[in-house]
Amino acid sequence: MEHVPGKKPEWLKIRLSSGASFASTKRLLDRHSLHTVCRSAMCPNLQECWSRGTATFLLLGTVCTRNCRFCAVGKASNPPAPDPREPEKIALAVHSMQLKHTVLTSVTRDDLPDGGAEYWVATIRAIRTLNPFVTIECLIPDFEGNERAMDLVMAELPEILNHNIETVPSLYTKVRPQANYATSLRLLQRAKEMHGLTTKSGMMVGMGETAEEVAISLGDLLLHGCDMVTIGQYLQPSALHLPVERYITPEEFEQYRSFAEGAGFRHVQSGPFVRSSYHAEALTKKTETVCSPI
């Protein structure tokens, strides 16, 4: 059954839950004045993840230099300078939360000479100094294709190197006009071929793509050395953002999961609420395909 935009279908109604872990996570993040993509991007899984004591840390502030039409993060051509104490603050938060796996991401900072790569390096090193047994996933921007900036981060050998293609190439002009599909694929290939990293990428669906286009993009990811993939429903953050073209059914997400698994991905998460870092810790522990609960 096809669901066009309008009232959200039942499977997209979030079951809110919170408790001691949720409150503790919020207090800790507020105390250290830390940013998370959970809040900045209005992630639908915030309640669940914080209740499990997990969060995805957002580096380089909360203002992005790109104008992607799907994203709720603030935008400006000249954001405030990064906080030099941010790496230390994040490392302390990882220690306080007793995390075994941490996910780092950042806004895109085209205003900085290296796109913020040195801050990435400083944060990874600060975390490992204070938390030597923590595994790290880095969800990085494209650094405008700057290979030196990419290499700075990749040379730190995070356990997972994540970079999202976000959508199919035919929608790039409409969805993320300042990005380049081929650049994203080359980044993933570089992480695999030059640095031997475990690689991951993600897509949103429901923005006007076809199932055939999704299948082709999954094939492109595999051809460029991508090991893991996440597929989730695009949800419009506000009336100013790109509207949802269609709500993808749970059955369709299962079909995407089955196709991606059969195509050769090591890990697959596919479901309405799946986001790039959703249950990221599970991917460091399991060898089978991971499916998101609906």
Swiss-Prot record:
[4Fe-4S] cluster 2 binds at C64, C68, C71. InterPro entries: Aldolase_TIM, Elp3/MiaA/NifB-like_rSAM, Lipoyl_synth, rSAM. One of its GO terms (cellular component) is cytoplasm. Residues 50-266 form the Radical SAM core domain. It is found in: Cytoplasm. Its EC number is 2.8.1.8. Gene3D superfamilies: Aldolase class I (3.20.20.70). The keyword Metal-binding applies. Its main location: cytoplasm. Its cofactor is [4Fe-4S] cluster. Pathway: Protein modification; protein lipoylation via endogenous pathway; protein N(6)-(lipoyl)lysine from octanoyl-[acyl-carrier-protein]: step 2/2. [4Fe-4S] cluster 1 binds at C38, C43, C49, S277. HAMAP family: Lipoyl_synth. PANTHER family: LIPOYL SYNTHASE (PTHR10949), LIPOYL SYNTHASE, MITOCHONDRIAL (PTHR10949:SF0). This is Lipoyl synthase. It comes from Pelodictyon phaeoclathratiforme (strain DSM 5477 / BU-1). The lineage of its organism: Bacteria, Pseudomonadati, Chlorobiota, Chlorobiia, Chlorobiales.
